[in-house]
Amino acid sequence: MLVKIHTAALNGLEAMPVLVEVNTQLLQGQQAEEQRFHMVGLPDNAVRESRLRVLSALQNSGFKLPGFMRYVVNFAPADIRKEGSGYDLPLALGMLAGNNMLPAESMQHIVFVGELGLDGSLRSVRGMLSIAIKARSMGFDALIVPQANAQEAAVVNRLKVYGAATLAQVVAFLNGHTDALQPTDYDTRAEFAAAQRIVPYDFAEVKGQIGVKRAFEVAAAGGHNVLMVGSPGCGKSMMAKRLPSILPPLSLAESLETTQIHSVAGLLAADSSLITQRPFRSPHHNISDAALIGGGTYCRPGEISMAHNGVLFLDELPEFSRTALEAMRQPLEDRCITISRAKYNVTLPCSFMLVGAMNPCPCGYYTHPTRPCTCTPGQRQQYMKKISGPLLDRFDIQIEVTPVPVDELSTAPAGESSAAIRQRVVAARERQTERYSQHRGIHCNAQMTDHMLTELANLTPAATERLKMAMQMLDLSARAYGRIIKVARTIADLEQADAVSADHIAEAVAYRSLDRRDWAEA
């Protein structure tokens, strides 16, 4: 008897349909000595091992299969490698239906995904949101998943999602006991709006550092990458962690995409649904290239994709592998990463704000107001050369951070709240959304192309003259020219100004500390 069950496989962020075909045959005579279980269709080790899990789960759930049966299982399409443990549930149901222990027609319009424990319990699998989206797009009526995945899958509207704790519950439901499983209710928009109000960090907690906080406001308003240079303990990490709190709130579409990435990576918490806060990722500097960019034997999103729609913070930037840092250059421009391996070729999104932090020299105290630096100009220059020019070029805002005096820490009042700063940032982003509405793929000032600078930046004659003067007097490099205009345009947007003035240019020039040719030579 041949039974067909619908399930799905992951390919990058997307899910693709997989048909599990289970052919059951009674063995007689000498055939009884033959191997009784065959799997075809490019299953990996985890899928091959499912045979033992499924047989034990069936036995411990009270289902007794007849002896001397041969099972041939095909995972179609057969030319795509099948990975993971999510095929356990459809395989078990196929074996039961092949032995007339449940009606095969009851499974025709349902997608089944889930890992089985030896006791028949259902365990969560990764990528459930992508699978639910695919199931709805293909017109299936329902999706049966482990209970721990039900909230995640129920985010997708117009699809019935049933969460099951055990295999026995699923079998009872398919045998007509409709009260064995209940559909999971989830009001996506209401839950999303409620969860967005939680902000874990606030700029009001930061004492002093008025200039640095202003730089972060400009960065958030224009989507600019930021590089902080300062001695140890001056608050670089503290401020970087608070950057997501002033970024515009995630839209529902951004939230769905961000949740998909975390789900595929297996990092979405059990019984959770949507990620409603912008991600903040801060990997250690000994991270491998594959962990940062993505890849591996089985494709996994890297840190740059995990930070999609959020912030990637690289502390101690010069300590990161040179190859890992250089590998980020193209994804920073394209806002996506294509990973090609022998077994797969996938493209993952990675549109994020990059925030880097580093010491100004090997000893760390070159810019410290009281502690003397013990490094020579040559040592400082050599230290800075660990960051290549093309990567340094990706940082629109480069600022020096100095320690806050002790008396200011104890007496200074609370700073401006993140909520107040965010209001100005959102207003500036709205102006940019309107400005770039006719330019596909451009959403903020940091993404402007070179030819758009002349067309859309709108510099006043005084601003143009101030920029020329700054380039000459400060001996700024050529790559700083376009970056200054982009940042100045953002400063103008924060002030709701249509044109970029000379004052806007002056502030933008102040954010190019490391671009001076004489930096670190003193």
Residue spans of the language-model regions?
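P-loop NTPase nucleotide-binding/switch module
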Residues: D179-V218, G222, P249-I304
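Walker A/P-loop
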Residues: L227-A269, D334
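Basic, amphipathic alpha-helical bundle interface domains used for macromolecular binding and assembly
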Residues: V40-R51, P66-G67, N74-G84, Y298-C299, ...
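Walker B catalytic acidic pair
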Residues: N309, D315-E316, A327
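Peripheral, non-AAA+ core regions of ATP-driven protein-machinery
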Residues: M1-L227, S231, S237, S340, ...
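Catalytic P-loop NTPase motifs of RecA-like helicase/translocase cores
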Residues: D119, L314-S321, G364
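Hydrophobic anchor at the beta1->P-loop junction of P-loop NTPases
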Residues: M228, L314, A357
